[in-house]
Every structure is written in C-alpha cells, then in structure tokens.
A protein has these predicted regions:
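Alpha-helix initiation and N-capping motif
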Residues: 1, 7, 141-145, 157, ...
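A surface-exposed partner-binding patch
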Residues: 1-114, 205-207
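Generic alpha-helical structural element
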Residues: 3, 133-136, 172
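Short glycine-rich, low-complexity/disordered patches
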Residues: 20-30, 62, 157-169, 196
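A short, compositionally biased
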Residues: 101, 123-126
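Short, surface-exposed beta-strand/loop micro-motifs that present aromatic residues
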Residues: 114-121
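Compact, glycine/acidic-enriched structural inserts
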Residues: 127-161
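Charge-dense, low-complexity intrinsically disordered regions
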Residues: 167-207
Length: 207
C-alpha cells in the first residue's frame, strides 16, 4: 500500500473544504526505514514506517463549533514512540509481571483517554485494538493497512473507531451515534453503508 498517498488524500480533502478549520495538518514522510521495529512486527508496520514518520491531523467544522465532539483527530506516533515503554499511561507500577497490557503499544494516540494500538508479542502484532484507558482493549479485526483505508473514509472523526466497536460488540455508544449522524453532514461523499462494506473487506480473515 502507498500509505503516503492514502493519508495525503485525507489531508488534501480537508484542505479543500471551506467549512473545515484545520488546527494541525502534518503527514511527515520518512526518507529511510526506521530501525526500531522488532523483526517479528507485522509487515504492515515495516511498510508504513518505511514511508511515513508520523501523522498528526486535527480539524473541526465551523458550522458545528459549538459541538466539541464534532471534529477529527489523527495522531499516529513515530515508531520510536510506539515501541517505547508505556508505563504510566497504559499500565502502572505494582501490577503483576504477567499483566497483558505491559505488552500493549499505542499507535494512534488520538485523544488523551483512548487510543488504538496492538500487542507487541510475536505472532500478535497484526491486529489493532481500541483501548479506552481503565477498560479492556477491544480487538478491531483489522491491521494497519485496513486501518488506514478506513481513516481515508472517516477523516479521523472523533472516536470513529467506536463505530467498529459497535459492529463487533453490538453495543451502541454516543460516539458511534455521533459518527453516523454527523459524518454525512460534514462530508457529502461519506456513506456509512460504504464504510461498513469497506470494513468487512479489510477485516482480518481468521483461520
């Protein structure tokens, strides 16, 4: 996948929308591969960080300025940050050595209280999980390539990942409701049925 092209489509689309107010719009390309990824990391991470260093996009729409949750945030971290120690944020001192979140790495730190990440364990790095801090991670059934494809449809709408969580768990949330309600009003080219269709196409096939 051409990750630079995929994520630049998001950036370019936002720049063309006169109703969108862009706070941050950064897609930093990598000139060489970052050597901090473990060899066993899924191929998608090696491909991604061979092209892109980090992505930080924040936007809102002036028609909905009074609704703080009607906005977009993407914050895909540099590889050296992703594969660093997340003690004090994801997990804390005093927990058992076997605590599974010690192996959890944050990829898209889109808001202070939640993120999308993965388990840095050989054979388990492919699938991304949604983590609302102090709760258990929810497997999203997609890898980094699928995540970027869905980002290009959702434009990083605030908590857009909750729509996937709803599809998986059948549990409704205000965030998912906002996504389905406001995205068609913000972007005329957005279609929730198409979003679901693409999600089903990029889901990891379980064997």
């Amino acid at each position: 996948m051409d990750y630079c092209k995929q994520l630049s489509l998001v950036s370019d689309r936002l720049l063309k929308d006169y109703d969108v107010i862009i706070d941050t719009n950064t897609v930093i390309k990598n000139k060489k591969h970052v050597g901090v990824l473990p060899d066993y990391a899924h191929a998608a991470y090696h491909a991604f960080y061979g092209q892109i260093k980090e992505v930080n996009i924040k936007w809102l729409n002036f028609k909905f300025e009074k609704l703080p949750n009607v906005c977009g945030k993407i914050n895909i971290l540099p590889a050296e940050k992703v594969f660093s120690d997340w003690e004090g944020i994801v997990w804390f001192k005093g927990i058992p050595e076997t605590y599974h979140l010690k192996d959890f790495k944050v990829l898209d730190f889109f808001v202070n209280e939640a993120c999308v990440g993965f388990y840095n364990i050989e054979g388990k790095t492919e699938e991304l999980h949604y983590l609302y801090f102090e709760e258990e991670p929810v497997p999203l059934g997609i890898n980094l390539e699928g995540y970027c494809q869905l980002l290009s449809l959702s434009y990083g709408f605030f908590y857009w990942q909750s729509a996937i969580v709803e599809l998986i768990t059948k549990k409704k949330s205000q965030e998912s409701k906002d996504f389905k309600r406001y995205m068609p009003k913000l972007f005329s080219d957005f279609s929730y049925p198409q979003f679901v269709e693409v999600y089903n196409q990029v889901r990891i096939k379980k064997t």
